[in-house]
Amino acid sequence: MDHALLELARRRPVVFDGAMGTEIQGRSLTAADFGGREGLNEILSVTRPDVIRDIHRAYLRAGADVIETNSFGANAIVLREYGQEGRARELSLASALLARQVADECSSPEWPRYVSGSVGPGTRLPSLGQIGFPGMLACYREQVAGLLEGGVDLVQVETCQDPLQARIAVLAAREAMAAAGREVPLFVQVTFDRNGTMLLGTDPLAAVVSLAGLPGVSAFGINCATGPEDMHHVLAELARACPLPLVVLPNAGLPENVGGVLTYRLTPADFARHVAGFVTELGVAFAGGCCGTTPAHIAALVDALRGATVGARSPVLPAAASSLFSAVPFAQAARPLILGERTNDNGSKAFRERLAAGDLEGMVGIARDQQAEGAHLLDGCLAMVGRDEA
């Protein structure tokens, strides 16, 4: 899609802001500031908008091109834990209006500033059956609707730990855009641990295959979980495969408990050096910070990127199928690609009988047998007359 922010990224690196949550924690707010719901950062957009405005302004003064709304958990999934599930659209709208106001105040024709609508992962993982598809879809759709109404320039689905959760959020965002009659760029960011997998075990190629090609996604990347020094190997893999512009927002290192206080030790200078290297060496187009980063970290990054250009990339995304854990390219070194078809109840009497009996272990056993026999992919079909596939 054509959008001024995407066009800007084709000319120079685009800098996002840093952390919201840890900045709020450093403000010594009381329970009264949260309306008696301490820990619900999103409610501050209503109860203490001055605090949120100050944080936004600090990042813009540091040189950020993009600020994120205070809406990371502004969906009914999270708000239900505070008894506020009916306020998702209200809080999303309020956060977007605050960020929009501050961004417009700091914008000029020569240097426009942008607002990103932050959509966090929530607290339920659909791949583990903790929440159903329709319920999660409705929650995200409501959140994004509020952000769009408040005037965000893009929607940022971030800190994703479950590919299915990310896919649901993308679908919800597109539905909300269609309902609003307004399409904006859609960024997707996943989270990898130091071992290079997402929380449920998804590897980088599987994440790219399952998410980067979704309709409407404009940029793909990673944020949170680790500092930049632990992201390099994953980001390098994404740079080789992802056909979309890359975005990276690391933490200020790994958190440490110092005297009972969660502390991030990576200095602004070291943070900027690492992240600027991602831009020039790995071709990252959008860079900023996550937990523990401050306006000082973003100011250092802006200085480090002054005059820099985004490194060239020639990504090659293989045609592949992805599971929750890994991706299998269709072009195998030792051909042919072998497709196991005995996990299809239309073609396997043994599988159909186990399906009818609800024998999950038996069905998995058939799948494992085919894998042991050399199958690269499995043809899974659970459609049976009279059976609820859900």
Locate each region found by the language model:
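Domain-level signal for soluble alpha/beta catalytic cores
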Residues: 1-390
